[in-house]
Amino acid sequence: MSVAGLKKQFYKASQLVSEKVGGAEGTKLDDDFKDMEKKVDVTSKAVAEVLVRTIEYLQPNPASRAKLTMLNTVSKIRGQVKNPGYPQSEGLLGECMVRHGKELGGESNFGDALLDAGESMKRLAEVKDSLDIEVKQNFIDPLQNLCDKDLKEIQHHLKKLEGRRLDFDYKKKRQGKIPDEELRQALEKFEESKEVAETSMHNLLETDIEQVSQLSALVDAQLDYHRQAVQILEELADKLKRRVREASSRPKREFKPRPREPFELGELEQPNGGFPCAPAPKITASSSFRSSDKPIRMPSKSMPPLDQPSCKALYDFEPENDGELGFREGDLITLTNQIDENWYEGMLHGQSGFFPLSYVQVLVPLPQ
């Protein structure tokens, strides 16, 4: 920084201290300017909080949001184009219903109904994904651009104005000790910054109809989502009512137990009056330590080398997103990387993926 720049910084700091500590009066801005500054400040706070709440409305599960952010970061590092989407609760419910509906089979009324409901829930999840995309494009992104560009630019102008005001007030207080030309230049710069800040704030407040249009786009997207959701649910309700009517009109099947097979008692002329008994085998020294000629085969798992980082699965883990590694309790997994404090990356049966740290017990830790 040049000597002139250092002097200017000293002037501003000295004036600020005299105002904060000594109670010196600085140049007052007019009421119209203060009113605009207050409105811009309220607008900035409103936009910032509305953005946060909108994201929470679309993606209410904070754990899923954090996990999605982590997976997207990993995908960018790996250069993957397709990123996993937010796991909609309707989609998770639909997959659960479809899975159990298939297990019950087509002969079960409940199983068929679960299949119908599950497919409808999955359609609702797709509609919800479309809502997320539309709201992001037409509401979240424009407001984020407003924060990053217009509001940030206004804050820059206001900060510059405050610095030039302090410089002008310091020189005005020492009028006669500094050249008049230097004081005049300080005043011109202060008035120039004030005009630029006023213009930028005025333009923002006068064009707030753009924010109204963006809010309207949010409501339109919600209306479209709810219309489609109502249509899907009405179709599902009709299907289920039709199944109830068909099941009620169908004659009930009577349960007929299978006839018992005759039980042969065999030879009843036993000395003790009971059932015939097989003679007990003789126990010898060699036979007491073996139950059969064939050795018992114990289940085995392919273990990674003892010097290779590895872990053992404590529970079953079902992958819900692309890039996750599923396993069963007792599986031995080769560790390749630790993503963060909650997630590992590893390999099992030739497949690589991510899995939660809490599901496994580390046998050989990763090198530090």
Swiss-Prot record:
Q: Which residues carry this modification: Phosphoserine?
A: S288, S292
Residues modified as Phosphotyrosine are: Y315
Recorded topology in the membrane: Peripheral membrane protein
Output the superkingdom of the source species.
Answer: Eukaryota
The SH3 domain covers 306-365
Q: Name one GO cellular component term.
A: anchoring junction
Name of the molecule in the record: Endophilin-A2
Native source organism of the sequence: Mus musculus
The encoding gene:
Sh3gl1
